[in-house]
Amino acid sequence: MSRTAAILLAAGRSRRMDGAIADKILAPLAGKPVFAHSASTFCRSGVVDTFIVTYRDQRQMVELSAYAPTPTLFVPGGHERLDSVAAALAELPDDVVYVFIHDCARPLVRAEQLVALHKIVRREDAVVLAHRLTDTIKEHRGEGRLCTLDRKHLWAMETPQVFSRKLICRAYAAVAERNLAITDDAAAVELLKHPVALLENPHPNPKLTTPADLAYLEFLLTRTNSKVPFPSF
């Protein structure tokens, strides 16, 4: 069976926490650190053989190691997200064929979604967890000029994003060659004109960005664990 790796990104600087939370990845959420939720979900999924965790400093690495799968390779993160991903890709074992890339600041990913993504990537080479946008989105073109975008074609990208190892390594090499700034991995693959499949996520999978997000994530976890259905509007 083809070996699969998971790159768990934990090296973010928590800049938008405005000092309220020193390290959002280690912040307590439903009785355990934010990082532990993603780590345990990937373990339960049974689709990952190799774990790589990017970290921001030695103290954080020690704390992360208490919740990381065994064994895990820890790799120092870079200044930006793309630098951390590139550093982790460079450390992949030679026999890895597929790669999950996941922001640990999204702790609500589900094991069944990982299984579905793993099945799709073996067919498509590139797949991203995503959801459709329901808000009206406008592009601001300056001087009060707005352009309404057709939301039927708009999706919000989430993580995990999953790729064949050869494809994502080629894509990140193209990013480095052109000295581009990207904020997700699918953007790198787009440079190669390679199609990216989307797996629609019907469940909330928000990213922890501000202090207020912690309370929202706690609420979502409580609803999920108690199996109380989400209201439909």
Regions found by a protein language model. Give the residues of each.
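N-terminal glycine-rich phosphate-binding loop and ensuing alpha1 helix
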Residues: 1-57
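Conserved alpha/beta core of the MobA/IspD/sugar-nucleotide pyrophosphorylase nucleotidyltransferase superfamily
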Residues: 2, 155-233
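Short, conserved active-site loop motifs that form the nucleotide-linked donor/cofactor pocket
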Residues: 4, 71-73, 154
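Residue-level signal for inorganic ion chemistry
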Residues: 8, 35, 88, 102-103, ...
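Short aromatic/basic micro-patch
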Residues: 28, 108, 148, 162, ...
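Short, charged/polar "capping" segments at the starts of alpha-helices
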Residues: 58-64
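Conserved beta-loop-beta/alpha segment of the NTase-like Rossmann-fold superfamily
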Residues: 73-74, 79-144, 158, 229
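A short, charged helix-loop
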Residues: 146-156
